[in-house]
């Protein structure tokens, strides 16, 4: 399960600044996530190839009464959900009564907590943080979040030990293997690709059912299972935790993940429901395919788009399900379809299904799209095929000129799966305009017949063999150079 890191502290100690710096590493910020308490933000970040969810819990006012109420309502449950808590203090302001009150609550929770002293730029760190040792939270990590100073050290000493113990792939070795395979195929040699021990067809497809409260997620789960496995009431938020349910359909194993809904801000009254979104985000990360359920009668809301943004940033396969389609007039149905085209036009790779989970209409067709999306996201593609497709795209539409020189695309290989990643090597490829990158992405999608999953394209510059090498003259060139210098001196 992807780890969760919570940022806790008084207002204006720099939590949001650190949050932005952490999440900017992936450019996958989901800020001010609708359905949460005011100023709460969720984002995805990465450190040394390991992903985690970061939560900015908002400020705690610090009065004794305020700590008791605000901590209970906003932060304590976030702390319980988190794997690591970063307790931030202001080194410039010094130790405040609110810091002591917050530290007392954190100590009582017995949650892994690390004290982070922010705003140490221009100060002597040892002297600035000395007062905070009285909080009894052990070592203090001085940083300057606005400038990024000390953040790397914080990540290495605090977050890395809590990440999954999986080393990032050795990119150089993989590329060398792909390049060797490509060279052999170019020379007409018969290349037998090594059999991969991993066969995605042998594993169950993990299917997350997500959406706002009361859109019919649990009803859909029960309809798929054919039994009432999940408690369903006609009121939002009856599901409080993600429920994993194994099942089999048409000889294929699945694991259904029914998640708690994401509710609009201001309508949340039960504190337990406020943090169920963490389970939703973790379920998305854990899933292979995500069913995003939308209420046809309420249309597409900002909460739906925020959840969709997190799914896209996660790179998960996607099937869009428009529920409660029964009983709508033809005129209303046409209006809903127009709204979908307008607001979700950029999601051209996802299948859209119109269903009634309550009555079962259209539910059976979902699994065809789920399997299609899963197969597309896990299919293995050879280097030779990807390079041929890249060359065809280049012939149909040449790359533009950059600083007077044509961008050259050399070869392409697979860089990962679920989502499919295509790595293109060449010269000046990082200067390609976004329009050409989108053209390549769409060309690969059409050529590979990929549906239901996003495709990511990464660009890498080829190494210059003459970089950092000085020109050396041959003996003949040296003699000519001496004669030329003599001639120039005589002419003067």
From Swiss-Prot:
Ranges of residues in domain EngA-type G: 3-166, 205-378
MF-aspect GO terms: GTP binding; ribosome binding
Key words, A-Z: GTP-binding, Nucleotide-binding, Repeat, Ribosome biogenesis
PROSITE patterns noted in UniProt: G_ENGA
Domain KH-like as annotated: residue spans: 379-463
InterPro entries, A to Z: G_ENGA, GTP-bd, GTPase_Der, KH_dom-like, KH_dom-like_a/b, P-loop_NTPase, Small_GTP-bd
Superkingdom: Bacteria
Residues that coordinate or bind GTP 2: 211-218, 258-262, 323-326
Chain coiled-coil ranges: none
Entry keyword annotation includes GTP-binding: yes
Binding site for GTP 1: 9-16, 56-60, 118-121
Any one of the GO BP annotations: ribosome biogenesis
Homology family: Belongs to the TRAFAC class TrmE-Era-EngA-EngB-Septin-like GTPase superfamily. EngA (Der) GTPase family.
Subunit structure: Associates with the 50S ribosomal subunit.
Role description: GTPase that plays an essential role in the late steps of ribosome biogenesis.
Protein name: GTPase Der
């Amino acid at each position: 399960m992807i780890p969760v890191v919570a940022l806790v502290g008084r207002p204006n100690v720099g939590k949001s600044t650190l949050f932005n710096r952490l999440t900017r590493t992936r450019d996958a910020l989901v800020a001010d996530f609708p359905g949460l308490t005011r100023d709460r933000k969720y984002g995805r970040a990465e450190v040394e190839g390991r992903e985690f969810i970061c939560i900015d819990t908002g400020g705690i006012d610090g009065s004794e009464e305020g700590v008791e109420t605000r901590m209970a309502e906003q932060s304590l449950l976030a702390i319980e959900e988190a794997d690591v808590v970063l307790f931030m203090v202001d080194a410039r302001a010094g130790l405040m009564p609110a810091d002591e009150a917050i530290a007392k609550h954190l100590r009582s929770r017995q949650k892994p907590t690390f004290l982070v002293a922010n705003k140490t730029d221009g100060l002597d760190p040892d002297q600035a943080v000395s007062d905070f040792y009285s909080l009894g939270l052990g070592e203090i990590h001085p940083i300057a979040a606005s400038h990024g100073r000390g953040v790397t050290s914080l990540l290495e000493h605090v977050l890395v030990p809590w990440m999954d113990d999986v080393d990032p792939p050795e990119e150089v070795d993989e590329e060398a293997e792909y390049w060797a395979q490509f060279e052999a195929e170019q020379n007409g040699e018969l290349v037998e690709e090594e059999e991969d021990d991993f066969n995605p067809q042998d594993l169950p497809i993990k299917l997350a059912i997500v959406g706002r409260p009361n859109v019919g997620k649990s009803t859909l789960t029960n309809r798929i299972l054919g039994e009432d496995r999940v408690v369903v009431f006609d009121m939002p938020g009856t599901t409080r935790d993600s429920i994993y349910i194994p099942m089999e359909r048409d000889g294929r194993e699945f694991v259904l993940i029914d998640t708690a809904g994401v509710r609009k801000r201001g309508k949340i009254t039960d504190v337990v429901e406020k943090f169920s979104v963490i389970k939703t985000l973790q379920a998305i990360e854990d899933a292979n395919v995500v069913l995003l359920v939308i209420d046809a009668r309420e249309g597409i809301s900002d909460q739906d788009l925020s959840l969709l943004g997190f799914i896209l940033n996660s790179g998960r396969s996607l099937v869009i399900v428009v529920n409660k389609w029964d009983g709508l007039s033809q005129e209303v149905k046409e209006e809903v379809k127009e709204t979908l085209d307008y607001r979700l036009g950029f999601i051209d790779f996802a299948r859209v299904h119109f269903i009634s989970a309550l009555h079962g209409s259209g539910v059976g067709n979902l699994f065809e799209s789920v399997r299609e999306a899963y197969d597309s996201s896990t299919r293995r593609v050879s280097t030779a095929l990807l390079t041929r497709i890249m060359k065809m795209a280049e012939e149909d539409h040449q790359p533009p000129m950059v600083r007077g020189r044509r961008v050259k695309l050399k070869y392409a290989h697979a860089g990962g799966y679920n989502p499919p990643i295509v790595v293109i090597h060449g010269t000046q490829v990082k200067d390609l305009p976004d329009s050409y990158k989108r053209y390549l992405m769409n060309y690969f999608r059409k050529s590979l017949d990929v549906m239901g999953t996003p495709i990511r394209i990464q660009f890498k510059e080829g190494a210059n063999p003459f970089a950092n090498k000085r020109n050396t003259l041959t003996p003949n060139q040296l003699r000519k150079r001496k004669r030329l210098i003599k001639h120039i001196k005589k002419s003067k």
